[in-house]
Amino acid sequence: MVDVKFEERRFESPGQLQLLDRQEAEEEEEDCFESIDKLISQGINAGDVKKLQDAGIYTCNGLMMHTKKNLTGIKGLSEAKVDKICEAAEKLVNVGYITGSDVLLKRKSVIRITTGSQALDELLGGGIETLQITEAFGEFRSGKTQIAHTLCVSTQLPVSMHGGNGKVAYIDTEGTFRPDRIVPIAERFGMDASAVLDNIIYARAYTYEHQYNLLLALAAKMSEEPFRLLIVDSVIALFRVDFSGRGELAERQQKLAQMLSRLTKIAEEFNVAVYMTNQVIADPGGGMFISDPKKPAGGHVLAHAATVRLMLRKGKGEQRVCKIFDAPNLPESEAVFQITPGGVADAKD
């Protein structure tokens, strides 16, 4: 086990760090959701459960996140069957009112994953949180993808070392993922680079439809193995390519909203952190007193979907500045971090 002093965030590597016991991680996952197979104990036919799984629904929690209209669209499921399935799922999952104390108790399952920079972690209240979407937007070379690469490694640290003790799913829409970049970051954290790469599942998306289908396929993997992070880099790129002009803007925003809804459901269903990067566009209404005004792409649809929004900009040399743009529980503030060969780290004076 690696001796990591998180008070000073200095990562020493006298040994090799591996994921914690697989059985322990799987037991933690079982506490997060109820498997769709448990519907059989409530009198639901095994064949109907298989149809739900074929449609990408693997947990009772995920089932309750679908409308009955969507469920009746699954081949072989009538309205009567859907009603019976939903009634059975409600016996296994509480989807009604709970007290504020219960919400507070549920929040204790939130895991905060270190970014590699103590200053950035403090800005975020401890790190990137599970059960929510964190969006980072900024110009090119502002550090968005570098944070993503560092999180690919830090997520695999034990929870006691400010990690997530889980695997990572990476959906790449711009071709910016570099496995060779992971190697020095893993070495910095004292981890076996080969094992770290094996715990990252990667997919290159080429259209917005492909991107959405990749999200649907994730449910099967996340129901079987302990995942703690989903990265989408970048969330908006393919939508800006596949939809052009004002005539297709309404359809684009509708499809974008559906995909963001899916991301939200994944975060809450499997207790994973969703980190997505976003591009910026020129802001004609930015005002004459702001030099080169820019705003995040995606409009209000994307703004409402992200729980925490981070604005990144270039600093001096390899330094970058992160500002809390929007968050329900964090004050508007800034932190300076640095991009190093070992990933994101605290800035050096």
From Swiss-Prot:
Q: Name one GO molecular function term.
A: DNA strand exchange activity
| Biological process, per Gene Ontology | chromosome organization involved in meiotic cell cycle; DNA recombinase assembly; DNA strand invasion; mitotic recombination; reciprocal meiotic recombination
Q: Which Gene3D superfamilies has this protein been placed in?
A: 5' to 3' exonuclease, C-terminal subdomain, P-loop containing nucleotide triphosphate hydrolases
Gene Ontology terms, cellular component aspect? condensed nuclear chromosome
Under the heading InterPro entries, the entry gives: AAA+_ATPase, Dmc1, DNA_recomb/repair_Rad51_C, DNA_recomb/repair_RecA-like, DNA_repair_Rad51/TF_NusA_a-hlx, P-loop_NTPase, RecA_ATP-bd, RecA_monomer-monomer_interface
Task: Give the UniProt keywords, A-Z.
Answer: ATP-binding, Cell cycle, DNA-binding, Meiosis, Nucleotide-binding, Nucleus
Q: Where does ssDNA bind?
A: R240, F243, R246, R252, R320
| One Pfam family this sequence matches | Rad51
Q: Where does the record say this protein resides? A: Nucleus
Chain residues that bind ATP: G138, E139, F140, R141, S142, G143, K144, T145
Ligand binding (dsDNA): R240, R246, R252
Q: How does it assemble?
A: Double stacked ring-shaped homooctamer.
Described function: May participate in meiotic recombination.
Q: Which family does it belong to?
A: Belongs to the RecA family. DMC1 subfamily.
**What is the protein named?**
Meiotic recombination protein DMC1 homolog
Q: Which gene encodes it?
A: LIM15
